[in-house]
Amino acid sequence: MKLLYTDMSQDLTEILTEQASSYAQKGKRVFYIAPSALSFEKERKVLEYLPQSASFDITVTRFTQMARYFILNTSNPKTQLDDTGLAMIFYKVLLHMGDDELKVYGRLRKDSNFINQLVDLYKELQQANMTVLDLQHLDQVEKQEDLVRIFSAAQDLLLAGDFDNQSKLSAFFKEITSGHLDEALSNTVLVIDGFTRFSAEEEALVALLNDKCHQIVVGTYTSQKAYKANFVYGNVYQASVDFLRTLAQTYKVIPDYVTTDKEGNLSFARISRLLESRHDFSTVDETVTEQDKHALKVWEVVNQKEEVAQVAKSIRQLLADGKRYKDILVLLGDEESYKLHVGQIFRKFDIPYYFGKEESMSSHPLVEFVDSLERIKRYNYRAEDLLNLVKSGLYGGFAQEDLDLFEYYVNFADIKGRHKFLSDFTANSRDKYNLDQINALRSQLIEPLDKFLNSRKQKGSSLLKKLVVFLEAVQLPSQMFELSTKASEAEKEQNEQVWKAFTHILEQVETIFGDESLSVDDFLSILRSGMLACDYRTVPATVDVVNVKKYDLIQPHSAPYVFALGMTQSHFPKVGQNKSLLSDEERSRINEATDEHRRLDIVTQINSKRGHFVAMSLFNAASEQLVLSQPQIINESQDDMSVYLKELLDLGIPLVEKGRNRFEAKGDQIGNYRDLLSTVIALNSSHLDLDLDKETQTFWSVAVRYLRKRLDKDQVLIPKVIDDVTTTKVDDQVMQLVFPEEEPLKLSATALTTFYNNQYLYFLRYVLELEELESIHPDARHHGTYLHRVFERVMGDSSSESFDDKLEKAIAQTNQDQPFEILYTEDQESRFSRQILEDIARSTASVLRDNAAVKVECEEVKFDLLLANSIKITGIIDRVDRLTDGALGVVDYKTGKNVFDIQKFYNGLSPQLVTYLEALRQTYKVDADQLFGAMYLHMQVPQLNLSQIGLEKLAAQAHKELTYKGLFVASETEHLTGGNYDLQKTVTYDKEDLETLLDYNIKLFRSAAEVIRSGNFAINPYTEDGKSVQGDQIKSITHFEADRHMGQARKLLRLPKKGKKEAYLELMAKTEEENQMQVSENTISFPVIDHAVRVDKKDQEDNHVD
């Protein structure tokens, strides 16, 4: 064995390539061994350093792959299993064990994460040259017994099924020991690069090969100073020094310090020596120079997005300076959190990149198909799982319109469970759904699925056949082919990998579970676990790309230019964690009890020295320039600076704050025309009117010149920056169709309220007639209709029965009405809602019982008013009351709290009661002095705070809550005193005031009608204070944002509370005369129409949405 080491300023790969080349020239077969994660990069570098750029005698590979070269022709009839196959073996073993057989892990038998941990432990034991019997001295004897029982059963299963139960290195080890490879190995040289430690399995293999091979050359990085030091604990090179000394002591070899004629980057070498001296408590007569500050930079950026943008700009500048993409390497502290930002921003800057990380297949439609299939069976046909399956794009050749219809109906009827999906759908809403069509679609979707999922427990091979029949029935193969025909080349490659993984898993299921009796649940669980564990394997489309990978795999001299992102305390250094079934303490006790070349790794024990060595490798990763960057905010939280970056700052490396000044007049601040274009668009146009300082003016002068040239060249148009939400006038043909000019405009109080809430909301509901998703479950509309029906029956019952008997009779009759019986007997939740409604009816009825001064004139009065021949006001009055003096009043039942607020009325948000009074006035041909008021009756159970009300006042307070609230005519209040009426001064009006309210209400209708007829519907939700928006913003459609579009909101007129009623009445009175003139001047003649009392469906719904 030959041991070599060199400083990190030297290129060890170049030195070892020379060694490999010299042995190859002597006719030796050379295997250049690198760690698995670095073999691709090592192969590229070795080829670059070879004089002839290629060699048939040198193979760059890893330990496990090298073993395949020697044992490839060795007869091995046993079936090979990958990780998925091993997981199936453990699943099968645990399937036959009961909860009581495993005292510690009994409840985890079918947990996929636990099975994956078993697979990891199985592989780790192989790498440690151990068996499960070596797992002594665990914290619990029961835990040891469970693991021995599981692994012993798995081993028996592997032997019984003739599966290969040893690793490639174990098989290689066996062949070497047998002597079959002595001749081949005698002419073999191993060159080992990139290691600072061996696993126990690798360690044993190297020891054996040392006696058989012609030579083994091991190289690593460390300094002469560190290797010769007596005390290395805490040294930056501790990992490599310990590695070298262990090998030197074991094989009685003195390591050689080697160098090349090429001089590395002096700046990185000097910084390395300074850092080493800080950790070994020595002194060096060196300081950081200006050249060093240029070679190594430390950035601080606000957040990750800005950080990646700054790197992208620097890359574009390097390209402008003549550099290549392949000369640039981007390292990430946290791959997952940076992946999205890197992808989006690099594409914006036209930077091709290769992300050296396997990507999970979990988002592929086929994986979603299998996942949904398993969840449907496990959760008994849950609606969302079934819809995910049919919407995967791989389930049958159904049209998207049919699938949308099916999904809409399932959500409407709240279909859940196998029984409901197998039964005919019968629920309907006003015959809105074509049940014949939907049931035919249901049969096509559900029947092949249920035929497979309802299969009895049987052999795995039989279930596989039934699965294939099901997949063919739903056209999965043809749908996968169709998916690929429309895909890009990258997507086609992904589809091929997914299909290959799927078929491979099916083959392994056949192999392992072919003769095993399985339920459909277990069968699908095995498929799902296998598919979710699969990853895409990607290769760069071209060599000339920017490589992106995690930083802890870095080697010195990886690229001329290196950018390391996310170098915060949480990620630099990375702290390894033990997530296996064995704790660190248990591992330590096991290692103490075992002999040489048998060892379990204890990750937490090597964190410190591994972190130091990775940091030194990172600081020497670049040959020209290294940028270390840290964001202040990462993953939505603030993080501190890494201790290694603090050390660099202490040495004198300056901290550069990037992204602070967006208007620096430098070329690299423009970088790429797409970025410049997006920056221009993102700027708030209002800021362009401000006075610009000289620096900003210089920036824009350079930017605009560059942008104009590039845009003219590519014929690109900059879209106009619009910071408001505007609408387009509705086409005249549409308006004529919805609101014919020869007919009066239909409006209701609810429609008017909607209009003044937000004009665009009116457009959606009454022009486009969009509806919210319906549900078979009762909601506020159904609750209100139910209570209306109860009180109609009570008030219309003229029999001699007592009031309470009438009420109970009305409740019973209403419950038996077919619509309510269907609604309120669907499930326990619906029945509970009905109980609550019955309680509300009984509570509210107490108000109706004792009201001798008032007689119910009529109920459910439909009205149809024609206003100046141009507006038809429609609606339904719940109840009309008559006083003993003949005055009429209106009662509107409400399930929620409503009061008459004159401020809201003035602003168009509460016109209902006044509109109903207008209907009374015109329907009964009475004057304002013959009306006594309009009021709401809240149908609810009073809710009282018992901590604030004594028991003696409880009944009185509850009775007080059940009162009529609205607006009343002052002259009629003497007839109402003593009744259940809230007669506050703020809600009582004299005859003249009532006339003013009625006239102003007409103005509200006329103003709304004028805008509606114009076809211009603004997005103008109302605001009360000008700071927040209370109106319906309909954000998902309008994209209205209060902070950006407040100027378009309709601000309500608000007056001080003191004298508010009188002030609003005065404002209304000012417009009274003008309104009368407009009515007389703008009267339009219409053909005589049927004035029969009728109302369209939407207005009926409006008046019952309480």
Swiss-Prot record:
PANTHER family, alphabetized: RECBCD ENZYME SUBUNIT RECC
The family line of this record is:
Belongs to the helicase family. AddB/RexB type 2 subfamily.
Q: How does it assemble?
A: Heterodimer of AddA and RexB.
Q: Which gene encodes it?
A: rexB
Q: From which lineage does this chain's organism come? A: Bacteria, Bacillati, Bacillota, Bacilli, Lactobacillales
Enzyme category, top tier: hydrolase
- Other comment: Despite having helicase-like domains, this subunit does not have helicase activity.
The cofactor(s) it depends on are: Mg(2+)
- Xref: HAMAP family: AddB_type2 (MF_01453)
SUPFAM superfamilies for this protein: P-loop containing nucleoside triphosphate hydrolases (SSF52540), Restriction endonuclease-like (SSF52980)
Protein name in the entry: ATP-dependent helicase/deoxyribonuclease subunit B
Give the intrachain disulfide bonds.
none
Select a single GO molecular function from the record's annotations and give it.
5'-3' exonuclease activity
